Amino acid sequence: MKRQISSYKGRKLCLWQKLLLSAVLAGAVTFAGLFGAVLYGSYDHIQGDPRAMVVLGCQVMPDGEPSILLRDRLDRALDYLEDHPDLTVVVSGGQGPDEPTTEAQAMHDYLVAHGVNSGQILLEDQSHNTDQNLRYTIELLAEEGYDTTEDILVVSNGFHLTRVRMLWSRAARARVSATVMVLAGSKVVSV
């Protein structure tokens, strides 16, 4: 056994081994870069003085209640609204095939039940994916007189925000200058 190890250490790598090693290293560097971008995008970056808040939709349960992820987004929005009670809120999300109501309506009902004035909530209820959420929300905000190149607060889950920034920049031709992270289940679990 000792002899094989010493002969292996002295052996040179052939071309296919070098290529395989290079591919593995390139993959690891790429993964680390993407992971870093997602991690960076998942932190709170509230900048400026947002003129409106957008809460992106997520699954609605068969009983019409928001899913855990959606409830976390809504609770984080409610936390922010405590200090900014006059902020316009856009709830964005259509109705999936297994949902009894639109995500926007479920979010509206949840926010109103928790004390938000119905008049300050705008519903975007036609979208079925993140790209549509953002495009339709930008159109709705523009119709209501908001400049979507200014600070807009977007509420979603941390894993989602890097993609949201990219899609918002493309749709609004401006960067998302304020975002909020929400942790799934509002709990940090150690394994």
Language-model features: locations:
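N-terminal type II signal-anchor transmembrane helix
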Residues: 4-45
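A structural signal for short, hydrophobic/glycine-enriched beta-strand patches
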Residues: 35-190
